[in-house]
Amino acid sequence: MADSSTDSADEGPSPKRRHLEEENTSSFLEPPLPATIRDLANLLEIPLDDCLVPCNFCGNFLTHLEVCEFDEKKLSLLWKDHCVFACCRVCCAATATYEYNEFYESTVVGRDIEEITGKSIFDIDVRCYTCMKFLDSIEKLDICGRKHFFHKVRGTWKGICRLCKHFQ
């Protein structure tokens, strides 16, 4: 006769043992995974040039320039089953266009964004609707001063960065 304290293959672990295992795993916290490619390179102790990160959408590895742009745009790495993915320049532009076309909500002119949000322009997070770069204060003030548009897309504000405005 089998000992009642052992787990049978059919029944799995006992409720008491399962609770103990859950307790042990929940008390062990994994360190946070890096959010930027530079942080990933530092964690792996390799030069940024040696970081090969695939694009989540097309699967191509990002070039060194795209790696630098990814971090400059303040985008975050995507982790799936402890595998890391980023987004290449072409897929960033395609994703930005898709989001704008599918999830557009509203448009405001220049400084009206402050009235709508109740925040200072310096406290509003804005990304480029073309390349997804995080806009700096000068770029946001330029949009306000020229009375250009801010667009609300998928609950976040979009404008145009200094580089993309020259290609429109």
Swiss-Prot record:
The keyword Methyltransferase does not apply. It is found in: Host cytoplasm; Host nucleus. Pfam families: E6. Residues 1-31 are annotated as: Disordered. Keywords: Activator, DNA-binding, Early protein, Host cytoplasm, Host nucleus, Host-virus interaction, Inhibition of host innate immune response by virus, Metal-binding, Modulation of host cell apoptosis by virus, Transcription, Transcription regulation, Viral immunoevasion, Zinc, Zinc-finger. Gene3D superfamilies: E6 early regulatory protein (3.30.240.40). GO terms for molecular function: DNA binding; zinc ion binding. InterPro entries: E6 (IPR001334), E6_sf (IPR038575). Plays a major role in the induction and maintenance of cellular transformation. E6 associates with host UBE3A/E6-AP ubiquitin-protein ligase and modulates its activity. Protects host keratinocytes from apoptosis by mediating the degradation of host BAK1. May also inhibit host immune response. Forms homodimers. Interacts with ubiquitin-protein ligase UBE3A/E6-AP; this interaction stimulates UBE3A ubiquitin activity. Interacts with host BAK1. This is Protein E6. It comes from Human papillomavirus 21. The gene is E6.
